[in-house]
């Protein structure tokens, strides 16, 4: 039975599976992701397909994802470190993390001295401009900031304490928990909210319950991806943190936010201008959890 190489990452707790794209059609990517994300298989909250040589990431549902983008930054850094330590710069990047041969290969050793700082640029599904990745650290722990050029973004006040932020590739409905308490059944509540605000046909929708408590913002994101037919109460959500920061910046005028995620790890969001262009950075930890091969029934189709 054919196998598919994988790596499993934790960008701020948002468990992410990355696979090599290998020319896999989008419909097959969706099916493979649905199988791999189940608890009986690899488990995870989202999946993406990477072409490292082309520096591209396509999420399984074609949505946009900041945390998966940050995981790719760590993957690229790990691949570069592997190639440097083997003294063979001609080897393709995939041979380190996303190949069958890499399943039993060790991770690169962390050299003495200060952590390396590296920068990459990738294309990501759903987002029109390249995403810059600023990577610090060594395997298996890094900090990665995704730096985005912001297009015109619509922020609508739908009701008291409810705002809809439409980002390219994903929309987020933000509910202030001081007004709208967190429901007992978040999945049912999110489904009703998507229907109420006519979001059922969006590629991806996050429903986020947020609050500020003793000066600390925190959020609980539930993300629905249409094409993979998935609903996950996520441990962290980078695009949701960005949407919340943009909404609060419009209301309160702040430009820097530290937003606690359900994992207990914050994501740091900064809004700034670069050459007159509106930009955003989303920064946080990324760790490599596992790498190897997985047997998926649809690989034989």
Tell what function each PLM region has:
Residues 1-142, 173-301:
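A glycine-rich beta-to-alpha transition motif near the start of alpha/beta enzyme domains, typified by
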Residues 146-186:
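Surface-exposed beta-loop interaction hotspot
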